[in-house]
Amino acid sequence: AYRLLSHRFQRSPHALSTQARFDALFAELGYDASFISTDYETGSAAALGNYIAQCLIDFGLQDGANEQGSYDNQYYDPVNPPLIPLLPGNPNISDLNRWQPLALDIFIDQSGNSLPSSAPAFLGPEWGRVIPFALATDDLTIYQRDGQDYWVYHDPGAPPHSDGPLAEDYKWGFALVAIWSSHLDPADSALVEISPATFGNFDIDQFPHTIEGLRDFYDLTEGGDPGGGRQTNPHTGQPYEKQWVPRGDYARVLAEFWADGPDSETPPGHWYTLLNYVNDHPAFTRRFAGKGALLDDLEWDIKAYFVLGGALHDAAVAAWGIKGWYDYIRPVSAIRAMADRGQSSDPNLASYAPDGIPLFPGFIEVVDADDPLAGTDSEEVGKIKLYAWRGPSFIDNPFDDIAGVGWILAADWWPYQRPSFVTPPFAGYISGHSTFSRAAAEVLTLLTGDEYFPGGLGEFHAPKDEFLVFEDGPSV
């Protein structure tokens, strides 16, 4: 583990301090870092460890990830010119169905690396070709674009296109994102009950099987899905305690907890955090699949980490293979581009365009002459406005300020993120978060023999005015 960790993190942010921690723990355990022999035939356990580490390192250098080339893309190129988020709109996009890079004054990536004056490249569009852990070739489709192969496991089919038979669903889906960004203000009166009594417990067999079915699954204006929760704790038989919180706090905490941005684990890392939470719970017993003899801590950790890692690796290969092939646009690009074109709901209203954004009263409207957003010379009249999170320009000090929600020009819409990151640098379809999370949740269920957290309840605390980093909060 020491050799592999030292190799894997040698180019990471704060690599020197990370290595110092590895060195300190290795020494504390009584091991000699200067012993580098791989001759395990001598019977040396340390040599065997070094040999296994070198095998893993060598395998990684030829597994298709292009580690030797700093994981750079070998043939993928974006079709769209970069969007400059600090400028209004999205005037230069050429294809509303394809991914668009962002041009940022400074980009701080998911690992905390600062890249000045950068348009970050698509992260992992060729990842479908990485050697998987357990994915089957029977589930593999190999596509070609520009003479290059794109490997796709478990192909879900194409997402809606702006100019295809599902154009209305394309518009609806991205409009939902804009509308749900209106839920990010703790000052509004909306409360949500977030205990297991209300959230979750939706049968996977009842998930929508069509794009059109999403309209019935998600609540467009209020947020949420049809999950019915559980009235009683399956371990104790007692009712779950209700937890009413401001919707704006819950939505912001949820967004930042799962954020792909700097100073955050990526979703696979979150699931290791959840596994550690389970491991450390006083009610948990280490029995593989919940049966048989108790395992010691080391055996359990090796098996659990190995199985979870394999599943998350395959989730990445599958999801990023899909992302690379379908190369789908992200919300900030689509929302701004549609709004630039106008509104697509009513040909009798101003700014009608068939490929514009749909109108939803109270959330997506047209600026009229009496609107505070009309401009000093009415230059914004006829443009699209959104009732949404107002964006980073309303935050001077993230420790004290809250951008809040209000009417803004759609040309200035931002997702809830920091301006040095904005949105993850890869295609929006298919969801990596969902793919990782479903895979990890199923694995934890199989590992522990229980689909619930120990004691039937898992808790995560987001302290008032401390947890959020994009802006101040949560408020309670």
State the predicted function of each range.
Residues 1-476:
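Acidic/polar surface patches and capping/hinge elements
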